[in-house]
């Protein structure tokens, strides 16, 4: 990493950094500089990988053009292999963009769920309330009252209540 810098130069840079930044800020500065260097290395590696991939694609295209000019019948094994790779790469690129028909892809429902309400016998409202006592629910005064400020309701945000924070 430090090809042109010797030990004495590194020591001098360290002493100057200690004098200029002080012992409190020097470790923070070193960490931030190392994170910048790591980010630049990552970026350089990603650019390098992209360039290599583009060059490989260009080589495959050149091989394909060469194969087309020769005719597809008498190809060398290397050219056949590169054509197959190119076809696979084209298919992998096209897969995410293919539109799938959701109506075609979903299977037909085999078991349909029928509503129990539709299958019940029609009765008058008076008969229904006698048959099902839980059908009418009256609001009780305790369930309608809001929570007091000293007792936050369950799941309430404690940041809005200063007593809960400290």
Curated annotation (Swiss-Prot):
Biased composition (Polar residues): 88-97, 112-132, 155-166
Top-level taxon in the UniProt lineage: Bacteria
Location, primary (coarse class): membrane
GO molecular function, one term: protein transmembrane transporter activity
Key words of the record: Cell inner membrane, Cell membrane, Membrane, Protein transport, Translocation, Transmembrane, Transmembrane helix, Transport
Entry's family note: Belongs to the TatB family.
Protein name listed in UniProt: Sec-independent protein translocase protein TatB
Originating organism: Shewanella baltica (strain OS223)
Taxonomic lineage of the native organism: Bacteria, Pseudomonadati, Pseudomonadota, Gammaproteobacteria, Alteromonadales
Gene from which the chain derives: tatB
């Amino acid at each position: 990493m430090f090809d042109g810098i010797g030990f004495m130069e590194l020591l001098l840079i360290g002493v100057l950094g200690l004098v200029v930044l002080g012992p409190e800020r020097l470790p923070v500065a070193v960490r931030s500089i190392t994170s910048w260097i790591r980010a630049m290395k990552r970026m350089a590696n990603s650019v390098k990988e992209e360039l290599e991939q583009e060059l490989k694609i260009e080589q495959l295209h050149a091989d394909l053009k060469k194969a087309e000019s020769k005719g597809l019948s008498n190809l060398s094994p290397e050219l056949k292999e590169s054509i197959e790779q190119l076809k696979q790469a084209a298919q992998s690129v096209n897969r995410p963009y293919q539109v799938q028909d959701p109506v075609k892809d979903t299977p037909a429902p085999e078991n349909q769920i029928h509503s129990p309400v539709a299958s019940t016998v029609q009765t008058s409202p008076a008969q229904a309330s006698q048959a099902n006592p839980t059908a009418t629910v009256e609001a009780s005064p305790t369930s309608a009252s809001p929570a007091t400020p000293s007792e936050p309701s369950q799941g309430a945000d404690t940041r809005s209540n200063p007593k809960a924070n400290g």
